[in-house]
Amino acid sequence: MSKTMNKTMNKTMNKTMLATALSLLCGWAAAGTLTVAVLDKEGKPVIDAVVVITPANKSALPKKALPGQVTIAQEKMQFIPAVSLVPVGAKVQFINNDPWDHHVRSSPAGMGQFNATNAGFELRLEGKTDGKPAKPTDITLDKAGVLGATLMGCFIHGSMRGYVYASESPWAAKTNAEGLAIFEDLPDGLAQIKVWQADQLIDALQQQANVSATPAKNTVQLSVVPRRRRV
């Protein structure tokens, strides 16, 4: 191989490596952090509200994806966790840890529960027998009508309520005890913010954020005070 050809190849490789490095650097610089604070009507932080971000660059993905499979337990006549967040198409495993039978019946949450045309899914889970493990049942949230929030209840025990939220956007999170949902490495540019909370029957107004290298914070205040959880 001639020296001229070697020089040409080396120059080409150097240019490629430089372009790759610049691309990675630009990608890093284009990532920003957005914190969304959710408050109730009285200005107190709200835990377990779902915050969904839709960035203008819809091809960008978070470093940590939403779980493709979750387990929801029925225990002490409660759904645990009370709110589950998954992507559309996720598998949800239901398990009854109580010694008596339970149902799982679903319907759209919010105002949709009053005029739902989709009956949702229904399951009957046998009670856990001493010395034997509970038998789980799986549901895949891949059908029309499961997008967004789904209310879960029990025919036998009317006080039982739980929710599963299926998000189309991969940028979604539940608020922590301080009422905060923190999104890192969001692509820069405009982003839509949607907040869902179980007791807010009418969705809160969507907000818009401008994501950049400078950390940003948006505050969303609900028009309700969520019911206190039963422990």
What are these regions (language model features)?
Residues 26-29:
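N-terminal signal peptide c-region/cleavage motif recognized by signal peptidases
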